[in-house]
């Protein structure tokens, strides 16, 4: 009986951990540091979005879907909200509604241009914005504006295949 209870408790704790959302407020430098500490994937896709951005919300499900289509060793999907502090509850509610769990971020208020330049110096500031890095945080690719499901799948397939040829 005691053994069964221990197994049940362990299963419950593991289930809770996998469905946990962690939303940290960060600068670009803190974002990179945190990703490097917590990531083991070959590719890191960072999507910058906001709850008030209609194109961001429209493409969001396509990006969420990527995590179920690829192995964790191949791709890590990270969302960074640009919403202000006063909208932090809306950000968290939206992520949970979209079944987004794990470690994600909200850009700290202020220093927008500094954040843009650190994330990708070629970024105009348009939302949504998606950038892909390798495991060492070397820039691989980026694009701005809303993209469709086919674009995301084709792009990630291509990047994973090209990474496989380098190894």
Please name every model-derived segment.
Residues 23-44:
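A short beta-strand-turn-helix
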Residues 48-62:
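Conserved redox-active cysteine motifs that mediate thiol-disulfide chemistry
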Residues 74-88, 100-110:
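Thiol-based oxidoreductase modules, predominantly thioredoxin-like and allied folds used
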Residues 94-127:
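Short, internal strand/loop/helix patches
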Residues 10-18:
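Hydrophobic h-region of N-terminal signal peptides that target proteins for export
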Residues 42-44, 48-52, 84, 126:
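Short pre-active-site segment immediately N-terminal to redox-active cysteine/selenocysteine motifs
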Residues 127-167:
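Thiol-/selenol-based redox modules, centered on thioredoxin-like
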Residues 60-81, 96:
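Conserved helix-turn-beta segment immediately C-terminal to the redox Cys motif
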């Amino acid at each position: 009986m005691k053994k069964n209870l221990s197994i049940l408790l362990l299963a419950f704790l593991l289930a809770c951990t996998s469905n946990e959302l962690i939303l940290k407020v960060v600068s670009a430098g803190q974002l990179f540091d945190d990703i490097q500490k917590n990531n083991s994937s070959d590719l890191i896709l960072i999507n910058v979005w906001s709850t008030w951005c209609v194109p961001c919300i429209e493409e969001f499900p396509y990006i969420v879907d990527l995590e179920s289509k690829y192995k964790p060793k191949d791709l890590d999907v990270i969302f960074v909200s640009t919403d202000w502090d006063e909208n932090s509850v809306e950000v968290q509610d939206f992520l949970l509604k979209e079944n987004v769990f794990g470690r994600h971020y909200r850009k700290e208020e202020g220093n927008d241009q500094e954040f843009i330049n650190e994330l990708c110096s070629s970024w105009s500031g348009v939302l949504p914005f998606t950038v892909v890095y390798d495991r060492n945080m070397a820039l691989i690719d980026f694009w701005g504006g809303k993209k469709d499901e086919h674009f995301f799948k084709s792009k990630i397939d291509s990047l994973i295949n090209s990474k496989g040829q380098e190894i």
